[in-house]
Amino acid sequence: MPVNKKKKKKSKYKHLFKEWAIAISISLGLLLCIHIFLFEMMIVQSTSMEKTIRKGDIIVISKFRYGTRLPQRILPEIFCRASGNREYPDFTQLPYKRLPGSDFISHNDFVVFNYPGDFNRPIDKRQHYLKRLIALPGDTLSCKKGFFIVNGQTLSKFPNSQSSYKVYDPKDIINDSVLKSLDIVEGGTITGSSMLILHLTQNQADSIKKIISSGYIKPNKDFSNQAVEMSFLQKGGIRWTLEDFGPIIIPAKKMNVHLDTHNIALYEDIIVHHENNNLEVKNDSIFINNTFVDSYTFKMNYYFVAGDNFHNSSDSRIWGFLPENHIIGKTS
């Protein structure tokens, strides 16, 4: 083959390779922009939203509806790992910024966010959680006998939400086949007894009641009487439970709250971890950044979220308020 033909063929391949490289780069760039600014897909990893949203469901997170949260680190994780540093240096962290959104955050929204209780990792590297939004900044929230009360209005149970039940089944009618037919996926028999603990919707509870000819089904009240060790509701000796607590005022940006030794535990994580202050309590006196205080003004908005699987959800009742800078987006 003549030399000039070889050169032409080689030049043709170079040109095709260049075109493909440009096309792939543009496509990857567009996908990255969509992922960062518009949408993200997520597989639900827990049962905390059963039966409204199920474990294994694929959901689409809309980031722009609340306003896209801009990237919070200069260097991607890959560069930190390549340098052999497993920590994320402070100089790589960017301040929290969010673009204008098309929607306001509202009661009952399904919100995806980074888990606020992981204080050892950058916010955007914390695990994704999905919950229902119960209370907004400035709302007054309480819970009585498992019913949330927001600004004096008692919320109805959500249609597909689950609660824990005790089922006494002396004739062993409730077997695996029955559970499968009723789509009951959580709970089981207490070893060596005819008692089952099941997480059920109201319709499932009604079906169980019809099936068992003897025995009984009733709400599992052990959760009400059981202290949740080290949880938000138990800090500072506050004897609240998952089903009965409050009232609590949800912190809002620029809201000023009185502080004392009785309520400081509710706001400790906000003051120290989310708003980066030093906090000390000495002889019933409170010091923030070495200054005596009896009040505090919040720098951000906060929210209260909960899972529809009421007795099997790690949510604000366990780890506290959700800061606005942890919110990723909305799903439906």
Model-derived features with residue positions:
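Extended hydrophobic leader/signal-anchor segments used for secretion and membrane insertion
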Residues: 2-332
